[in-house]
Amino acid sequence: MKKLRLSILILAISAFFSQSFACTSILVTRKASKNGSTMITYAADSHTRYGDLYYLPGGVHKPGEMIQIFDYGDGRPLIQIPQVERTFTVIRNANEVGLGITETTFGGRAELESETPAIDYGSLIRLALQRASNAREAIKVM
């Protein structure tokens, strides 16, 4: 009983002081699932980000068109970048061709934060899903 109480106490303390505000992902490959499906889950475990399910319609875009990049956390405008000719429809962490991206991050060390950020991880995920049809293309986009 004493060991159980100690274990629970250690677990509680480590959860409080660890990077417990990181996001959680569960990945299942087709060889690991019973029916051959690939599955991903994503939970933004932060107390400030509650589940959202955004929809970004794909389409064909005009040459010279620009898109505004916003901070994923607070929504402030960051930079504008050129739009590509064709984008895929995105619903949260997956696109219309079946590419899915999830992440496990935490706030990070304060001294590494840029005072003039241009793009953040949430925007990178969205751009990759809009512009890539597979993981290799997504890496190139990022």
PLM feature spans:
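Sec/Tat signal peptide C-region and signal peptidase I cleavage site
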Residues: F17-A22
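The feature marks the mature, well-folded catalytic cores of soluble enzymes
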Residues: L124, A128-Q130
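A contiguous strand-loop segment
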Residues: T24-Y121, A132, V141-M142
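Bacterial N-terminal signal peptides
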Residues: S7-F16
